[in-house]
Amino acid sequence: MSDLISQNLNMIFKTPKGETVHALKDVNFTLKKGELLTVLGPSGCGKTTLLNITAGFLRPTSGAIALNGNEIDGPGVERGMVFQQGALFEWLTVAENVDFGLRMKKEDPVKTAKKVEEWLNIVGLQGFGNTPTYQLSGGMQQRVALARCLINDPDLILMDEPLGALDALTREKMQSLVLKIWKETGKTIILITHSVEEALLLGERLYVMAPRPGRIHKEYNLPFASMGIDGDLREIKKTPNFVSTREEILTMIWNMEEEIMGKDI
C-alpha cells in the first residue's frame, strides 16, 4: 500500500486586506512507504503549508491527503514532527524530553527507560540522559528532538527545516545522522529545506515547488541519499552529477525569485 497520497490539494488564504493567496494549487503526489522526500523552493511556494496540512495542523480548502488510506483531518500519533527549533521542554532532562510522549500514554516505565537508552545511543547522546536540556548545544538539542519523535514509532516523519539553524559542521553531521536513521528504521520522511545542497544530499526524491500559486514545479529522482548512507557527503558534493543538478536547480529557483521580484515592483 502507498504510504501518503495527496489528491488535488488546494489551500487558499485571505490576507488582512482581503486579498486571496493561493498557497497551494492542485498538488498531487504519491509517497511510498520508506521513501525520503525533500521539498525545496523559494519563500512563499507553499512548502511549509504542505507540511502543516500533512501534519494535520491545517485543513485544506479543497482536496485531500491520506496516510495508509486514512484521510488526514488533524494531528495523529502515526505522524511525528521535528521543527527547525527543537521545541523541547528546556527545564526537563534529555531523557524526560525523549520519553515525554510515552509517559503521557502511561507506557511501562521499565520498557520506556530501555527505549530511551536505545534511541539516545542511535542519535549519539549516550550518557546524556540526566543532562538538563538547556545545557545542550543546538545540534545536540536537535538530536534530542529526533529521538523524541522516533521513540513514538510514527509511520511518517515530518521535518520542517530541522537543520537550518545549525552551523555548517554540525549541519553536516546531522545530515549524516538523518540518513543513518532513514536506513536503520525504514521510515517514510518528508524534509523541508531552503538549502539546495541539503535537498540533493538527503532526498531520494526531491520536489522543487514554485510560488503564486504554490505547486510542484519539477520532481527529481536522485542517487545521492543512498550514496551518502555509507559514503562521504563532501565527496558526493564534488561529483559531476551532483554539481550539474545543483546548478540546474539554483538557476531554476533564481529565475522564480526574479519573477516574483518583478511582480512586486
UniProtKB/Swiss-Prot annotation:
Enzyme Commission number, as recorded: 7.6.2.7
Reactions the enzyme catalyzes: taurine(out) + ATP + H2O = taurine(in) + ADP + phosphate + H(+)
Location of the protein in the cell: Cell inner membrane
Stored SUPFAM superfamilies: P-loop containing nucleoside triphosphate hydrolases (SSF52540)
Cysteines joined through disulfide linkages: none
Binding site for ATP: G41, P42, S43, G44, C45, G46, K47, T48
Keywords attached to this entry: ATP-binding, Cell inner membrane, Cell membrane, Membrane, Nucleotide-binding, Translocase, Transport
The keyword Amino-acid biosynthesis is assigned to this record: no
Annotated GO CC locations: plasma membrane
Top-level taxon of the source organism: Bacteria
Keyword Membrane: yes
InterPro entries for the chain: AAA+_ATPase, ABC_transporter-like_ATP-bd, ABC_transporter-like_CS, ABC_transporter_ATP-bind, P-loop_NTPase
ABC transporter domain sequence ranges: 7-236
Example GO molecular function: ATP binding
Topological relation to the membrane, as annotated: Peripheral membrane protein
Record note on quaternary structure: The complex is composed of two ATP-binding proteins (TauB), two transmembrane proteins (TauC) and a solute-binding protein (TauA).
Its biological purpose: Part of the ABC transporter complex TauABC involved in taurine import. Responsible for energy coupling to the transport system.
Similarity-based family: Belongs to the ABC transporter superfamily. Taurine importer (TC 3.A.1.17.1) family.
Protein's UniProt name: Taurine import ATP-binding protein TauB
The species this protein was found in: Pelagibacter ubique (strain HTCC1062)
Gene name tied to this protein: tauB
